Amino acid sequence: MHVCRPFILVVCALASIGATTMKAQAADVAAETPAPDAGQQLHAMLERYFEEWLQLNPLLATFIGDPRYNDRLPNSIGPEHRAQVRAMNERYLAEARAIDVAKLSPADRISHEIFVYERERMRAAERFPDHLLPVSQTGGLTTLMPALGSGTNAQPFATTRDYENWLQRLDGLVTWLDQAIVNMREGIAKGVVQPRPVMEKVLPQLGAMLVAKAEDSTFYAPVRTFPEAVSLADRERLTKAYTRAIEGDVVPAYRRLRDFVRDEYLPKTRSTVAWSALPDGEAWYAHYVQEHTTTDMTAAEIHQLGLSEVARILGEMDRVRQQVGFDGALEAFFTHLEVRAARVPPPAARGRRSRRRGRGRAHAGAGVRPAARQTRAGRRAP
């Protein structure tokens, strides 16, 4: 079809004018829309960080009552997860430093300072191989997961979905237990091992997980008490699934770890107990001190501060002893106070005694002797 050239030129011109107008309007709208201020940037960043942190640490989500990730258990001591945490930390540290602190409110400045401090502390911690010490007698997934799987902890077991979520978490536990062996072998090679007394206490904890039948396992407890929300068909299916998981996956994984600790790791444990005895241990311990106290004081300085504070407080107590006229040493004064405290009736008894005194005063004011003070003859008198 033939179209005259002048018409085409007119159409193109109109289109160009329209496009230019639209761009100008868009620019005007952008100019009218204010950029988020520093406070809004900070709040949005903190919200995003918390959400991403929950995804990387789903157990935290469970413990704070957020059920979205109850089916997840990452291999937190594995290289991939540790790399994800490291990358996330660096990304948010850079974003936080880009915020104009001078434009923040006083409260937001504190939030910003704390956030940056925590990111810097996490970066500093990368120097120290905590992941090579994944198992101890006081913590770690080896003891936490049985507690969660007992059905009496933060992990919910109220619906069919809850039961299925836990099965998926058990898969993650098996992966974690095997990763622990890999990491601890690396720790042996690098001289980063637990003290022997610690692992001697770990062995019976691991041994307690090695049951012959699923019914004897802590992890079996939830299927003993299904809630009404779980149908009979699902109960039967889930009971079989839990039995398979416990006997076929979880118990064998615990056995592998127990055997490794007993046969390979325990002979390589250290006779020392101080953290400073580890490779780079002095700096490692100093890092922990700073992390838990948020000061730049050394361990020796903190220890000395504690000694001086105890001396100061004891001096104050001794002045009180002198003020009340107690004739004896300070230790005897402490004993005296404990004995006196033991003789003080509990609040309920003091309240009853006070009410009795109050009734007595009321009777006396009305010309009536309290019953406790009347004689038998008086009570019989008209």
Task: Please report, for each region that a protein language model flagged, where it lies by residue.
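Bacterial N-terminal signal peptides
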Residues: 7-18
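N-terminal maturation segment of proteins
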Residues: 25-382
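N-terminal secretory signal peptides that target proteins for export/translocation
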Residues: 1-4
